[in-house]
Amino acid sequence: MEAFDTHTGIGVPLRRSNVDTDQIIPAVFLKRVTRTGFEDGLFASWRSDPSFVLNLSPFDRGSVLVAGPDFGTGSSREHAVWALMDYGFRVVISSRFGDIFRGNAGKAGLLAAEVDQDGVELLWKLIEQSPGLEITVNLQDRNVIAGTVVLPFRIDDHTAWRLLEGLDDIALTLRKLDEIEAYEAAYPAWKPRTLPTS
């Protein structure tokens, strides 16, 4: 997973609340056996509308999604995070996230930045007044910068640390490799073992 420190990209105003994971990527797009290639399913039912924000320039090149409250609710669907990332998003800003979505985002390298709803409304206004406005999100300082506006965001310390270090679940496990190997070496010979295949 790529480490996340600071990201600057075009802001995309998604003026919708209660966006669940089925709206982010419908189930029909979940048949892949790989972890990439889900961008075509992102907001698929909404993208059929030519006036949908991701069909409009410059928002079609955005990488900072500014969404309404309760983004990513519903079923645990890692594909929702993967679809956002495959499309090019590195950050989603909202006043509230679904708990499972927030966890999946942090594990995959997508920053879910929680900003007060007044801050979200201000970002929408700024983006719509200046389409193509670049937003900078600084994880170290935990702030969002849009023009002269600086807004704090919330994220739990553990997820922030994982993102800053670029640690997915496998990388976290490998940090304990010495302890794992020591445990395996001390494991009694008379107990069952799982042996590597050759």
UniProtKB/Swiss-Prot annotation:
Coiled coil: none annotated. It catalyses: (2R,3S)-3-isopropylmalate = (2S)-2-isopropylmalate. It holds the Pfam family Aconitase_C. It comes from the Bacteria. GO terms for biological process: L-leucine biosynthetic process. Pathway: Amino-acid biosynthesis; L-leucine biosynthesis; L-leucine from 3-methyl-2-oxobutanoate: step 2/4. Keywords: Amino-acid biosynthesis, Branched-chain amino acid biosynthesis, Leucine biosynthesis, Lyase. Catalyzes the isomerization between 2-isopropylmalate and 3-isopropylmalate, via the formation of 2-isopropylmaleate. Belongs to the LeuD family. LeuD type 1 subfamily. This is 3-isopropylmalate dehydratase small subunit. It comes from Mycobacterium marinum (strain ATCC BAA-535 / M).
